[in-house]
């Protein structure tokens, strides 16, 4: 869409932060209003993360107005909230391309702009990176400032507290801003707190505080009394004890939608030494009433009509794999009181809403704490329960040691329901589920299953849940099921594949998601098609039989080729000295950028036409 100068006259004056800083302060509330309306207009036309950005408009304007970006370095945690940042930093006219193939990256991305200091996508990384950047800036000696913006969800992760603990120890000059949009830490916002924040962030208070420490440094009892008195006075109105104990100077909470007040506070804090912590209160979805009322639904949106106040309803077609999992979960929980389900802050995405309502005492949302989620599940298993960790493939990476050390070594019956496995699409490199087969396959005695359709997915969930000799994993894709009939649940024989079609000369060994495409290719090439079902243990007998009866083997998976299921087939053949040509087809050795799933598969040659072309080229 083209930018409408008449509709956004103030925003039209700002295509860079240097232009922003030329505006008089009095015009900034109008700029914020236009920026919020432009964001609504753009994202409703193109789709994307929505509610978070509406809540950070004033903060974004204030930060770029006060700090000399990009010389001063601004780090956004996760990046859902960074759309206004992109608009103000030279990408205003391209915001309608965000999350699309060849368009703006969905998150801050170093390769896209010098204003994007840290490439992000997963949460809770900003403070750790910010400490490193701040230390580097101090050694550089050019008076470069470092600011990290983190949300109240991301700050629940252990990594954020590890970083703050370190910052409190080494005391770099940096500012951490907590964007609290869920009222989860404090509701204590108002004129008194805003006034107090400006006082506490001012140079007078800072110098008095430091001067007082120096004056009374030789008189321990009085120094301690002064410290306690100061903390008592602040503690009456400021809920910052935790952050102060970690070594930060805590300011807030302040109104995150008062752009002029934010500018005053940020200017006061800009020159303070040591780690500073500013707590701001915002409303997710600010300025668009439907998003304010339902920020979860409006967190990420498809194209929609803003005047309707509603998102388009699903066409009511095939269920998603997440729903298949959620339905199975409720069905199983109704029969077995030992079932416990765990999610690291992905209730809606993992299909667990109904379960959380029906079985609240057996539903555990541990927040953004993947490591804790896995070891918590280990504890439940030790206690005699049957834990299921529902987690996206890309986020399971964050808990790899816990899978190994706390679950697998102890052979605990924890089941991992791995959603978003394979190509995910619009969220790009940071969210593709490209690696789980590779990093799980090497874990001793792990059972790994890859369904080719929704019925198989249910059977595998049932099989994994009733397996008691160690951990299991069922990995399934983002998107809708394929429409097969659901049959009664029964346990599958562990490590056994299934021949779906008999052919000649060529055998396709398929692992999971691409089974429908593999079936088309097998029909076209008159190839044998095997639904391998298990990545670990592999059906070695069936693999050797296929090698004996065919001239060529093809392995097919939506996982990295390196270390994936195909590599396992190669290892079996080598171990048995079977010399047969094998073509491994899967995800290539690079990080896959954003685009729709269909676009990515077509570009990577993982649709039916692409798979057939790869095979023919290899055989030629």
From Swiss-Prot:
Residues holding Mg(2+): 152, 181
Protein name (record): 1-deoxy-D-xylulose-5-phosphate synthase
One family name in Pfam for this protein: Transketolase_C
Alphabetized CDD domains for the sequence: TPP_DXS, TPP_PYR_DXS_TK_like
Cofactor: Mg(2+); thiamine diphosphate
PANTHER family linked: 1-D-DEOXYXYLULOSE 5-PHOSPHATE SYNTHASE-RELATED, 1-DEOXY-D-XYLULOSE-5-PHOSPHATE SYNTHASE, CHLOROPLASTIC
Source organism: Citrobacter koseri (strain ATCC BAA-895 / CDC 4225-83 / SGSC4696)
Source species, domain of life: Bacteria
GO biological-process terms attached to the record: 1-deoxy-D-xylulose 5-phosphate biosynthetic process; isopentenyl diphosphate biosynthetic process, methylerythritol 4-phosphate pathway; terpenoid biosynthetic process; thiamine biosynthetic process
GO CC terms, sorted: cytosol
Lineage: Bacteria, Pseudomonadati, Pseudomonadota, Gammaproteobacteria, Enterobacterales
Assembly and oligomerization: Homodimer.
Alphabetical list of InterPro entries matching this protein: Dxylulose-5-P_synthase (IPR005477), THDP-binding (IPR029061), Transketo_C/PFOR_II (IPR009014), Transketolase-like_Pyr-bd (IPR005475), Transketolase_BS (IPR020826), Transketolase_C (IPR033248), Transketolase_CS (IPR049557)
PROSITE patterns: TRANSKETOLASE_1, TRANSKETOLASE_2
